[in-house]
């Protein structure tokens, strides 16, 4: 983990004040120990309204009934995403990797996850709103950021949330330990198969993707 990550706040005080200023009536926010929290239980409807009003620089999610803030991607994060897009286009030109995809996740679709990437057939999201149902999403993708919540969010909460709505594959590109982790075979809210691969080794993606990632380039983005 990058030095200082554990102490880094989720957002600057100025951004928090902007967010709190546009919060819907009845949604009370606070900044505690650098984390944004709601003072009262938050409904899905109130979250969606808050997210619509949030400043463009603030990326919000609703995970396990709680408000979460995603870190703004840095340069290496963006380069890794482009690498994945290129790999997908090379092997499966019928598919697209859609960035910053709002997904209805968790049991009963009560969660709202903003996936770094969602792999689906070209044109799949045409006509969709801000948050899409999981049907038709072949793979959810998360690229870890160097923030203190990434362990719980990307390694614990997201696999459960995506498996609960039967997304066939969850791909975690883990920048803390330079691995690519493939989760597959969702069943009863868990992925039955989890395979971890160091950067620089071939990574086989199971059906419905059914192609192999060349991860050698990822070593250029180790930090």
Question: What is each residue range found by the language model?
Answer:
Residues 1-223:
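Gly/Pro/Ser/Thr-rich low-complexity, intrinsically disordered segments predominantly at protein N-termini
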């Amino acid at each position: 983990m990058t030095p200082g990550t554990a102490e880094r706040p989720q957002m600057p005080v100025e951004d928090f004040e902007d967010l709190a200023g546009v919060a819907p009536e009845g949604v009370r926010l606070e900044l505690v120990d650098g984390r944004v929290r709601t003072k009262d239980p938050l409904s899905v409807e109130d979250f969606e309204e808050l997210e619509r009003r949030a400043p463009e620089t603030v990326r919000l999610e609703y995970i396990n009934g709680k408000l979460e803030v995603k870190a703004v991607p840095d340069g290496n994060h963006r380069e890794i995403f482009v690498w994945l897009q290129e790999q997908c286009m090379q092997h499966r030109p019928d598919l697209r990797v859609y960035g910053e995809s709002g997904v209805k996740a968790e049991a009963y679709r009560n969660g709202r996850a903003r996936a770094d990437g969602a792999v689906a057939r070209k044109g799949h999201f045409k006509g969709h709103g801000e948050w899409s149902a999981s049907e038709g999403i072949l793979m959810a993708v998360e690229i870890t950021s160097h923030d203190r919540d990434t362990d719980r969010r990307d390694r614990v909460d997201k696999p459960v949330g995506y498996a609960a709505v039967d997304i066939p594959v969850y791909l975690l590109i883990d920048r803390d330990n330079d691995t690519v982790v493939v989760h597959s075979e969702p069943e009863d809210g868990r992925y039955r198969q989890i395979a971890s691969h160091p950067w620089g080794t071939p990574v086989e993606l199971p059906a419905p993707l059914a192609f192999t990632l060349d991860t050698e380039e990822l070593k250029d983005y180790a930090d």
